[in-house]
Regions:
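Catalytic nucleophile-loop/oxyanion-hole region of alpha/beta-hydrolase
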Residues: 54-56, 61, 76-110
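Short beta-to-alpha linker loops that shape the active-site pocket of alpha/beta-hydrolase fold enzymes
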Residues: 29, 49, 72, 77-81, ...
Length: 188
């Protein structure tokens, strides 16, 4: 299943509606007549790509492996440049809420939502995982998602080679794409 993200991001998406973020679900089939509810954990996967593209090897391939391991999975293909921070953090927060809202339908344990990311996607996962309680995410959750900040907090993080180093060792290209015209203001 694919879905376009839009709630709370309408003004952002008016600029380039064809570049909206998408969510793709990978949900194991349920057979309620033959099995008890399993309440699987779910992994939200954020592929890397320097905020310029989404690496194909870090999306569906990871989701299929998670299914094999007993998890349900969602791939969040978040907005890329020219969209800049904090758009992607809002999209990740929306995705956590969306998964929790569908937990019963998908036989997912709503208290076992893991946010995973690779490279730039790891940066995004780390951002929501550490910033969910701050004013920016809390006000977005309340105003646009109609929920408390705790509802968009991931229950765990899985970070694969995240782009989280700043200063002279930072992966500059990722941060240029993420911050756009605000690059000089925020980079160090």
């Amino acid at each position: 299943r694919d879905c376009l993200l839009s709630r709370g991001l309408g003004d952002v998406y008016k600029r380039q509606p064809e570049k909206k973020a998408t969510i793709t679900t990978y949900i194991k089939e349920m057979y309620p007549d033959y099995q008890d509810p399993f309440n699987r954990p779910l992994v939200i996967i954020c592929p890397g790509g320097g905020y310029d593209h989404h690496s194909p090897r870090e999306g569906e391939a990871v989701a299929v492996k998670m299914l094999e391991l007993g998890y349900n999975a969602v791939v969040l293909r978040y907005s890329l440049a020219p969209y800049i921070y904090p758009t992607q953090v809002y999209e990740a927060a929306y995705t956590v809420k969306w998964v929790r809202d569908h937990a019963k339908e998908w036989d997912v344990n709503p208290d076992r939502i893991i946010l995973a990311g690779f490279s730039a996607g790891g940066h995004l996962a780390a951002c929501l995982g550490t910033m969910w309680s701050g004013d920016m995410v809390a006000s977005f959750a309340k105003k646009y998602l109609g929920c408390d900040k705790e509802y968009v907090r991931p229950d765990g993080l899985l970070l694969g080679y995240p782009v989280i180093t700043s200063g002279k060792d930072a992966h500059r290209a990722s941060f240029v794409k993420l911050l756009g015209e605000n690059y000089e203001k925020y980079i160090d």
